[in-house]
């Protein structure tokens, strides 16, 4: 049994914490929200995120980060991208001088605005190497709702040090949650972040009344864009046909459980972005990631026409139907381009 600290009590963080408790580990789940902490501890409920799910009574929540991470062998961060640096900064102070250093894992899917950095890069900058044994990315097709009811799920643990990836594989794996290892952190993180862009587009197509052919085309050509950008930064092309690539893309771009798909659907129905964000009440990572990926592609001269079209819809108020027409009216080219 290991002590594991889980930082972030949203849908995914709380369900992963619950899984680890059921795997026999001592888990402390950290949240800033004391009311949420009290409800998790007293009623074993997290209604804002998983209203119908009852958590294992062995799961302990706290608003005290020091209590959560003290003595933890593994620290799992499941924080929205925009909050990663702040939480990592707090964590760095708490880990200063701690031995043995814990293994860090993150399950956040996004790119930092303005710097365009991946989450592992932010963590490496904020938390000194002496305060951590490694940084592992946990990613793949894994809706929290499915894991909560113990549907069969498979994900990837990616780390340049495969021994660290294998440690996380053993920590999380059970009869319904299977973890594979990979050493391609860049590919895993780009796949995890960029699929949210395509999920927005897929939802928008459904909202506009398009059917299976259109969604299949979007997902396939969207994967080509994800691969192009990832490879430009050193990712292994094979990663994008794995769980953290096409696997995560398919589940996020086809399921109504995906908040990015739902947000795109509302946009396709004619709602304004500000209203969609307010209605959702949760972070829609794909909106910010679209901007970051578009700007990154411009800087690296990577062709990402679907991403560019979504950028214009989200940030320049272009009509969605016009954006789709524009994509279809581009000069025809080879599928390999």
Curated annotation (Swiss-Prot):
Domain of life: Bacteria
List of catalytic residues: 195 (proton acceptor)
EC code: 1.1.1.94
GO cellular component, one term: cytosol
InterPro entries noted in UniProt: 6-PGluconate_DH-like_C_sf, 6PGD_dom2, G3P_DH_NAD-dep, G3P_DH_NAD-dep_C, G3P_DH_NAD-dep_N, NAD(P)-bd_dom_sf
Locations listed in the record: Cytoplasm
UniProt-listed Gene3D superfamilies: N-(1-d-carboxylethyl)-l-norvaline Dehydrogenase, domain 2 (1.10.1040.10), NAD(P)-binding Rossmann-like Domain (3.40.50.720)
Annotated positions binding NADPH: 11-12, 32, 109, 144, 259, 283, 285
MF GO annotations: glycerol-3-phosphate dehydrogenase [NAD(P)+] activity; NAD binding
Range of residues in the leader sequence: none
Catalytic activity, as annotated: sn-glycerol 3-phosphate + NAD(+) = dihydroxyacetone phosphate + NADH + H(+); sn-glycerol 3-phosphate + NADP(+) = dihydroxyacetone phosphate + NADPH + H(+)
Binding annotation for sn-glycerol 3-phosphate: 109, 140, 142, 195, 248, 258-260
Pfam families hit by this protein: NAD_Gly3P_dh_C (PF07479), NAD_Gly3P_dh_N (PF01210)
Family designation: Belongs to the NAD-dependent glycerol-3-phosphate dehydrogenase family.
Stored NCBIfam families: PRK00094.1-2, PRK00094.1-3, PRK00094.1-4
PANTHER family noted in UniProt: GLYCEROL-3-PHOSPHATE DEHYDROGENASE, GLYCEROL-3-PHOSPHATE DEHYDROGENASE [NAD(+)] 2, CHLOROPLASTIC
Protein name: Glycerol-3-phosphate dehydrogenase [NAD(P)+]
Native species: Limosilactobacillus fermentum (strain NBRC 3956 / LMG 18251)
